[in-house]
Amino acid sequence: MHEESCDELQFQHKIDTMPDEIANENDGNVLHLSQASSKCVEDDIQQYINGYPDQEDDLMRNENYKFFMDEIPSRPNGDYIDTIHNEWWGDYKRLEDNRKYMQWLFPVRAKSCNRQAQELFPHEIKKICDCKEAQDRLLLSYKMMLDFYGLKLENKKDGTVVRSDNWEERFANLNRSKHNHNRITRILKCLGELGFEHLKKNFIKFILVEILETKTLVNLQESCFNYWIAILKDPSERAEMSVFYEQLTKNMSDSLT
């Protein structure tokens, strides 16, 4: 099983492996989950939005912070974060095939199948958010993965992303590789935990256009519609993206009449 598939909670793995549980609404665009899967989605989203209120902190565990400070390497088969940025960037085969580094670059509060990667604890969140060096490294990790997906960050203040020069090749890979959709879920969750919530909305907005308007990333629709929009922490941003989605689908319908 892919590491990223394990990183998602049970509902996401169920979506990945049991597509017959997903039914299309009449317009063919809005995706709906079975009742059981929908409950799992709702519970996980609420845990994330509410900041995992039942999570117990462990002040003795600091591996995520140490990794962000370039003090320890990712494990297994990994490296120090600065080395990853310097030597792995643009090595698409390595970034694709190695399934052990994402849990270190983008830690979240849930445990993963990488037993050598630590879940993110509340005290680490504060330390990473308060440290410019750690923040700069997280932003660089995000830019590296955007490049891997055929994108680049045009504006770090509002999160606007655009296609990179090799977008066609990279989009093709992203469109066909479900585990990369799960990686994006992890990235978005991590950004929201570690001080970069403001980068998420315009990334999602870009993906919606590529799904519904240009149709270059149609296979991302389940993750985007059912999850990514919902893990925007600001209710006004969730509402904005819902309106934007509805407008795109209306434009599609109008173009067919």
Regions found by a protein language model. Give the residues of each.
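N-terminal leader regions that mediate targeting or early regulatory function
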Residues: 1-158, 162
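Alpha-helical bundle/repeat cores within regulatory domains of eukaryotic proteins
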Residues: 156-257
